[in-house]
Amino acid sequence: ERLADSPHLAEIREYSMRGMPIYAECGGFMVLCQELQINGKQYPMTGIFPARAEFCPRPQGLGYVEATVEAENPFHPVGALLRGHEFHYSRCVALGELEPTLRLSPGVGMSGPGHRAKGLAAEGPDNLKSRDGLLVRNTFAAYTHLFAPAVPHWAARFAAACRKNA
């Protein structure tokens, strides 16, 4: 409840609207969603992404992942291979159109095991299973925790995005 009442949520949203670079992983991903659901109760978040992060009683993603970048963004070039891990007890439910930028193999990504996001197909490219990474303006968020030494382009591209939008 304290997070939902924080004035910082509005500040984060304003920074995103102005195009400032924001890069979030896991808990940061949840803050950038429209809402967070815990024990059936919903709390408003920044609303940058039209999605709800729902906490579950069991892990929804656990283990090492490799992610292939499928959409251009300020932080990762198309075709880049990202290495990291996922460990999350929440899943992403689409409340509007979502266009994931990463394909995981292995990995669960935004959708928990056996879960389909609202309005998206059970199979094919529109399924959130094994998908991760949302982008709006210069705001990127994913459940995947990068292993930075294995993603050498990341720091330089993040710094360049910051310089460009200073």
Placement of each model-derived feature along the sequence:
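Amide-donor transfer/coupling interface in amidating biosynthetic enzymes
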Residues: 55-166
